[in-house]
Amino acid sequence: MTSKTIFAQSSAKGKAGVAVFRISGSLSLLIVERLCGKFNIVPRKVYYRTIRCYATSQVIDKALIVYFKGEQSFTGEDVVEIHTHGSVAVAKMLTRSILECDGIRLAEPGEFAKRAFLNGKMDLTMAEGLVDLIESETLMQHKQAIRQMEGELEKLYSHWRGMLIKILSFIEGYIDFPDEEIPQSVLREAKSIINNLTREISNHLGDTRKGEVLRHGIVLAITGETNTGKSSLLNYLTMREAAIVSDIPGTTRDVIEAHLDIGGYPIIVRDTAGIRESDDPIEQEGIKRSLVAFKNSDIRILMIDATNINSVNQTIAHLLNDVYTIIVINKIDLVNYKYDSSILPCDKPIVAVSLLKQVGLDRLMSEIVSYAEKIADPGNVPAITRERYRNSLNKALELLQLVNLENDLVLAAEDLRMAIRYLEHITGKIKIDDILAEIFASFCIGK
């Protein structure tokens, strides 16, 4: 527990219908008394009161006030929420009036959540799930964040930790009494648990980073020769003029990026410079960046002009076999297009469209969503959402693979202890100040 009472605006700053302010700590009720006068406040009940500046008695606003008693609050401390009108002036006056009280200060970013963690209201994975929920922009990101915030990863890692503690207790018992012979049944059970955990952690790590990709966004790059309709496709996807569309080859010279929600998945679309032979050094640099963006993307859309399909250049031809590539044949309104397997591979989705006439685009969207599901949908299994989880799990796995119960039990016990610690690093059972500071600094103020 920390003695200092903290305060912050939890809602977004600026003009709004309602603003929410949060106070956490032992002085919460005293501050309410200073603002509203003394009254019998019952936990979890809403009160409508006039709030005034304590020093001048000037009316600040009429507000709703809710009190949450320590064990039933978000932070595990006494918490008061004040709901005012969303006026900038009200926010300034209320903040100034509250901070005039001794023993209270403005909260640091993430400090409310940090207190919730320190008071045992949530573990670190749940706290980070809360961050992901706040930052989620699509349905699938929201779904993953809710699962983590409700303790899906915490339950899994705590279960693994419990199994390792069980084995460690077996081993330490025989280390303390070396004259006792370990029964074969105990050895078999311990080996079985270690083998099962090794397999489960390996499978968990072999998730092709779906949780991390979903959290950060799926990168989709659009490339192709000049004037195939790449910028027109970007404009269609964004439903605005995000890129200049022109008949002049080489109009797009740099990578243009847009963040979209497609089928509930966060898609980062990158329109790239058209690929062709050019003597212009600026355009050459744009083409170079296009190929890098294409290579580093998760989903690739290769645009081909239906009126010029027989003259696909070699650079483009090499891109046809990339994983998760969708081949889009554009301008089918200008020619009677027919698929030719001698020109295009048959193992990739080939979508014939007319961006001008808005033909074939529903199927293109379906293909994008289909690839997004393969890349970033973890299904019903818990997903690793952060690199720090992955690093700790890899280290725990390496230690489990070293455990040999047939030889040195002291060494085996130490390997198990270290594996347990790495699992505890993830959930925060072992509190490392540097890790805590980094995690909670990423929160917004007021959370």
From Swiss-Prot:
GTP binds at residues 227-232, 246-252, 271-274. It is found in: Cytoplasm. Transmembrane segments: none annotated. InterPro entries: G_TrmE, GTP-bd, GTP-bd_TrmE_N, GTPase_MnmE, MnmE_dom2, MnmE_helical, P-loop_NTPase, Small_GTP-bd. Pfam families: MMR_HSR1, MnmE_helical, TrmE_N. One of its GO terms (cellular component) is cytoplasm. Its main location: cytoplasm. CDD domains: trmE (cd04164), TrmE_N (cd14858). Coiled coil: none annotated. Binds 1 potassium ion per subunit. Mg(2+) binds at residues 231, 252. Residues 217-373 form the TrmE-type G domain. GO terms for biological process: tRNA methylation; tRNA wobble uridine modification. It comes from the Bacteria. Belongs to the TRAFAC class TrmE-Era-EngA-EngB-Septin-like GTPase superfamily. TrmE GTPase family. HAMAP family: GTPase_MnmE (MF_00379). Exhibits a very high intrinsic GTPase hydrolysis rate. Involved in the addition of a carboxymethylaminomethyl (cmnm) group at the wobble position (U34) of certain tRNAs, forming tRNA-cmnm(5)s(2)U34. This is tRNA modification GTPase MnmE. The lineage of its organism: Bacteria, Pseudomonadati, Pseudomonadota, Alphaproteobacteria, Rickettsiales. The gene is mnmE.
